[in-house]
């Protein structure tokens, strides 16, 4: 099976690296030339938390047209780049290619399905972490993490099943989950709260949790999100979601979520696929989402004024 990984940041490099380590035919496709060059020169340096790292040989390119048709394309680009990436990847895709998104947020599968056969689209939710240390270098922690996956239409697909088997053999702990969509929305609770609020405020997760006003916002965001999910037939529970926020936040109090890191680097965020998705789905279903809409627009203002700068003083 030939696999291309489109978007080889921290998580894409981990997924592709573990597959390559197990001798799967993998090609990284990413526009970051320094990363691609480092991988082609020395290999991908994979460093498990608390253990010795190792170099893994894997092919990498900035040009998707050089890859040829593959059996699987795994998308891990930022949501803001989904349409651009799928258009550039069409030369790798034919009527038999499985296209799997492991991206954050809601709405990427629909975007991808506009360009490829709907029955070939699959998605998954990742439950482990990875950090891009520098060009050609990642650190990661798998622990008991898994990837819950399913086809977009929920129907059995032998080629998709073959992919899951290969991912499992490579140590990625992938499995077919009937409630994978539930897990997408459960993860959205985390992203819509911690990622976005920490990004807007420039604080760590624990610092947000220590503020009662932070919980006022998180309860409001979560209540709307759960209502939208329930209307879509997804059985999220409000109290369970709040407890999940508390438990996760306590585990990683000193962490700046990925969206906050994007803001710090002044790059586009995935807000359209996080709170923006809640707002869009709410409008379709006739559900008001004022908390999500407010933080969505605040983040848009921040993105649109990156070049203005945030440092200011008030003269006396």
Question: What are the residue ranges of the model-derived segments?
Answer:
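Active-site-proximal catalytic alpha-helix in oxidoreductases
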Residues: 181-209, 213-226, 253-254
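Rossmann-like NAD(P)(H) cofactor-binding subdomain of soluble oxidoreductases
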Residues: 29, 53-137
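NAD(P)+-binding Rossmann beta1-loop-alpha1 motif at the extreme N-terminus of oxidoreductases
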Residues: 1-52
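Short alpha-helical
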Residues: 34, 80-81, 107, 155, ...
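Short, hinge-like loop/turn segments at secondary-structure boundaries
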Residues: 44-48, 117-119, 138-142, 192-194, ...
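NAD(P)-dependent Rossmann-like dehydrogenase/reductase catalytic/cofactor-binding core
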Residues: 169, 219-316
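Rossmann-fold dinucleotide-binding core
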Residues: 102-183, 187
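Helix-loop-beta segment of a Rossmann-like dinucleotide-binding subdomain
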Residues: 93-96, 138-150, 201-208, 255-265
């Amino acid at each position: 099976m030939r696999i291309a990984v489109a978007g080889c940041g921290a998580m894409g490099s981990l997924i592709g690296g573990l597959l390559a380590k197990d001798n799967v035919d993998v090609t990284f496709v990413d526009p970051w030339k320094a990363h691609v060059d480092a991988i082609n020169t020395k290999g991908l340096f994979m460093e498990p938390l608390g253990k010795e790292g190792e170099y893994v040989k894997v092919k990498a390119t900035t040009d998707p047209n050089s890859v040829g048709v593959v059996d699987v394309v795994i998308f891990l680009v930022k949501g803001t780049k989904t349409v651009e990436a799928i258009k550039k990847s069409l030369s790798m895709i034919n009527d038999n290619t499985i296209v799997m998104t492991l991206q954050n947020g809601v709405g990427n599968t629909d975007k991808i399905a506009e360009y490829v056969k709907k029955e070939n689209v699959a998605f998954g939710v990742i439950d482990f972490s990875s950090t891009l240390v520098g060009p050609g270098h990642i650190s990661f922690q798998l622990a008991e993490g898994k990837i819950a996956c399913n086809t977009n239409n929920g129907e059995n697909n032998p080629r998709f099943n073959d992919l899951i088997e290969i991912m499992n053999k490579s140590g990625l702990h992938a499995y077919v989950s009937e409630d994978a969509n539930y897990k997408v929305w459960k993860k959205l609770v985390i992203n819509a709260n911690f990622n976005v609020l920490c990004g807007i405020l420039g604080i760590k997760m624990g610092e947000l949790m220590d503020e009662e006003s932070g919980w006022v916002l998180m309860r409001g965001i979560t209540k709307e999100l759960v209502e939208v999910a329930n209307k879509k037939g997804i059985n999220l529970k409000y109290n369970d979601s709040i407890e999940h926020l508390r438990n996760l936040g306590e585990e990683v109090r000193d962490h700046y979520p990925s969206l906050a890191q994007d803001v710090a680097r002044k790059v586009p965020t995935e807000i359209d696929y996080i709170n923006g998705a809640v707002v869009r789905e709410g409008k379709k279903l006739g559900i008001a989402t004022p908390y999500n809409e407010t933080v969505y627009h605040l983040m848009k203002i921040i993105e649109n004024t990156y070049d203005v700068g945030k440092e200011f003083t008030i003269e006396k």
